[in-house]
Amino acid sequence: MKDIKKDPFDEYIRNLPPTRKELGQAWSTAIGLQDVDGLKPSEYLYETAKKSIDGEITIDEAGALINSYYEDKEGRSDSEERTEEADKVSARIAKLLSDKAFIFSPMQYISIHRELFAGIYSHAGEIRDYNITKKEWVLDGDSVSYGSAINLRDTLDYDFSQERNFKYDGLSLDETIHHLAVFISRLWQIHVFCEGNTRTTAVFFIKYLRMLGFDAENDSFAENSWYFRNALVRANYTNIQKGIYETTDFLEKFLRNLLLNVKYTLHNREMHISGKFLSVQDDPINDPINDPIKLEGREKQILDILYENPSITRVEMAKRIGCSESTVKRTLQKLMDKGAIKRIGSNKKGEWIIVYKK
């Protein structure tokens, strides 16, 4: 006899796969996060991601295909090894972001690092046992003061206990965002691991924000992951002699875009402590949103439509605007050439991702 108290849909719900939109967002974020270490995934990774988004393969099968792809490659150069890291870690991040399971704990944080970098770093999931410094572009070659190796675990446990006991009730959204910026910047500053700290912190933070009830599913991490890292750096750096003080202002701008769908344009050059990159002409960052994109009338029309409906077809766009489908196709290509939009998924089932910010 069946248990009438048991929810007949319980098993189905528990095993419900992520939606195409969620998969697309997970892959986009996963790929974008490789920028924090200057890594670029291969074309094979993009092809595999598209198959996953289109439902041709599962997220687990995508990871297996990536692993198999590199098993057959021997004698790789340094650049090829970096591409392999980008591909494998992208697939693993996409899987973690597609999984709703999460516990707010130091062990979860460490586990994420292990899952992302197992077989890539020999120290995956291990707390570092030596002190580190890192020259930062945004600090004009200076370094943040990272956590001391002798008490990393104690520091990590302390930060988690402080956040676990923090009460968000009664806070305004601005106060909440400020607190979240302080928490995540302090967690990142510990730099528990030898490598891979920013990507681990980003994945953990996204899952924590979801646990708090936030929708962290827009393109902020996908398009501005290096800005996120530089903002973390500026939140942890003070040089009184130079008149530079730690600030979460940049990180809070990023979080407002992420959590409140605000449309701040995020410029890495604005964070450089020297101020020498504030003019567009001196901007060294090869970033499609660093410099203004000039759009023509038809391009603006199509962009407005894509903001409303990223899944709209060319035929539907042509009807909306009152032009031919071939005109829409040419305009979309111009927008892609200018770096204003990009396409994820197949022609039939894909979606447009807006890079240009109004």
Map each language-model feature to its residues.
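FIC/Doc superfamily catalytic core
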Residues: 1-358
